[in-house]
Amino acid sequence: MTEKNTNGKLKFDAVFADGIAKSKSTVEYYLLPDEEKEEHHETDAKPLYSYPDSTEYNKQFPEANKYYSKDSNWQSALYSGLTKDKLYKIKAKASKEIDGKLETGKEVTSDSFVIYEVKQFDTFPKIAKYYGVPLKNIMKDNQVMDALVVANNTIFIRNPQTNVPYSPAPLTDQDKMRIDGALMGRGLHCEFGFEPVNLNTGNFYMDQSDVTMNELNGEFSITRSYNSKGTDQHSMFGRGWSFNYDQSLSQMEDGSLLYMRGDGSYLIFDKNEDGSYTAPDGYVYDLKAVSYKDTDHDYIGWELTDADQSIWSFDKYGILRYVTDVNGFKTVLDYDDDYNLSKITTPSGKTFGVKQDKFGHIKELSLPDGGKVTYKYDEQGNLISVTDPNGTTKEYQYDDDSRMTSWKDENGNTVVKNTYDKEGRVVEQTDAEKGTATFKYGKNSTTTTDNEGNKTVYHYDDQYRTTSIEYPDGTTCEKTYNAENQLASETTAAGTKSYTYDAFGNVATETREDGKTASYTYNDQNKLTSVTGYNGATVTYSYDGNGNMVTSTKPDGTAITYTYDDKHRMVSQTDGRGVTTTYSYDGPNMTGYVDGNGAAWGFTYDAMNRAVTMTDPLGNVTSNSYDANGNLTS
């Protein structure tokens, strides 16, 4: 249960478990590790699905989220006051007297979880990466209303992979150009903090998604990114903005290619004597020229393959036309005769219509369900408002140099205010809770002071890679890099943690402070094939020719197997006991599954691939409804 609001507040209050057991059985449960050796708790399983029921708990935590769908027939008591950074899980088993004999079911274990207190310089993507969990899971579990994370928030992390708390030669002008370009967006080896600011460069950077939906190749989104140091760039969303499908290639005088990325950054690929191209150090890309036929002529275009084996196809003008993932699922971009983007078609055939004004700015985005997102610009080409399908509007304000000075959310609340120096760096920032942070820039260092007076110093080299951090409590963290521009080591008071990599940039080994090493291997698609932990135990993975995982084998030899259909959707999963669950689909949406006991579940979806009904094995139907923005309303 989490308290939240549109100003970025997220406060974890408590957690409870619920599940399905035989009607009128007694469910015994306890929290690990706190109650492992103490008296366990009991509750009765109801005849009907009555849980989760947050009514009673909302009296204790009135601002916490509420649950409406009823998916289970028992529920635990509330666990609150949990210790941060401690790994928890809940165990339960049911028993029932049948014909005078007590029958007890198998003990089951919930997902593990930790409670994390957000630090001053965190962002949700960094938190997700550190804990090794999908970002969307964190956002969903905590029902995040604003993607800006606020220091001292407490959040729920499900199934974390850890519960451990968190002088070269002068550069030429061309070197500086390469570095400046790569530092836009989420600059490699840079620190980000506050709302957020690149603490190595002073660039204010943020991204906002106007639409997200489930697709055959995962989550499809249209996401805008803003860079305060990129205001000389004019994109489809105005000055300083970019979006994930606004990508292009252009050629430089020396034959090298400049790749403009969707987050506003750019990379320069050197052209070799044999005509091939080399990516900058630290980036896993393969860029090659290809020939293709357009009407009656052959043309040269380019294909860019990333670390996930997705292929980004550019035409003769260097304009992005297709994105094809490792399984062959293709996202298509169509343009009119004037090369205005007219529509984006997802792998399952969903179409997003695009209208642009005479300046090439996107003014309207039409959605598959008939909804629309509209955009307005000022005379300088700055994006000043975005109105969502619900009719609510975000607003953006800029200074005379088109640097964003503030923006307001859909409720009219000012989320952030920025003040810049003459070099375009953020020197003062006020957040939604009126907390003000300051930034002082020195030679190869930045000193930040938060609203409580805590000072942190960030040091970086001439490539703006973080080399050390001095924290308010006097502790430090030092970082080194190898010749391929990859993080080689991190040294703190606890010791040094070091990393090695394979030829494709994948982490091959991690050696922690006590000298123990974990190792990783990969196949030719950069898919993880084995993990040998610090304790020497190895988990292995195998894949079919399309890159779908077909087995995962634990150290004891127990294997889980998976099968897929011709669209690479998982249609069965068999666990180590031989119990099989089967799945059925309509396009990207799972329409049903049957578990190992023969219990069947069914689902239906709307035009935006959102679940609208769920039918449980007892025939009970739960319905969901959404507003025009896709927010669950009932």
Language-model region placement:
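Solvent-exposed loop/turn segments flanking beta-strands in beta-repeat/beta-sandwich domains
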Residues: 16-44
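Surface-exposed, short loops/turns at beta-strand junctions within beta-sandwich domains
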Residues: 78-87
